[in-house]
């Protein structure tokens, strides 16, 4: 599972008997959430995020930074296509209020060292992708393919 999908897969693994759960750009417990997410949980400030700006923000970034960024933005739009505001509000609530106290035992956690969504400062027991950000699954697919070929075969 990637990002929020990592949380979902860990919850699914409590229902089915998974041998391993692989998460990328995610967290293994609420202790690993960013300090801003922990603050948002306590204050409920996440309820006031204006998520409708996402599409307009992407268009602004593409306009300001040019074709190279526009290509990257289009890639994100293709692979990160769930943008419904109700879904985003719901998923942020589920992430911020996740009640997983301790990591489950069978998790393989791969994480970029430059991830700003889930910064590594709070993470333990993960496989680092140097200079990888939250979108390592898109930007570092070669590294991931090589890792999986060597370690999961």
Please report, for each region that a protein language model flagged, where it lies by residue.
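Catalytic histidine-centered segment of alpha/beta-hydrolase-like enzymes
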Residues: 132-147
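Gly/Ala-rich beta-loop-alpha elbow adjacent to hydrolase catalytic centers
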Residues: 1-9
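Conserved alpha/beta-hydrolase catalytic His-Asp/Glu region
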Residues: 53-100
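Short, hydrophobic alpha-helix immediately C-terminal to the catalytic nucleophile
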Residues: 9-14, 145-146
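Short beta-strand/loop motif that positions the catalytic acidic residue
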Residues: 109-111, 115
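Short, hydrophobic alpha-helical segments
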Residues: 148-153
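Short loop/helix-cap segments at secondary-structure boundaries that form the rim of catalytic
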Residues: 13-15, 101-104, 117-125
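Flexible "cap/lid" loop of the alpha/beta hydrolase fold
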Residues: 15-50
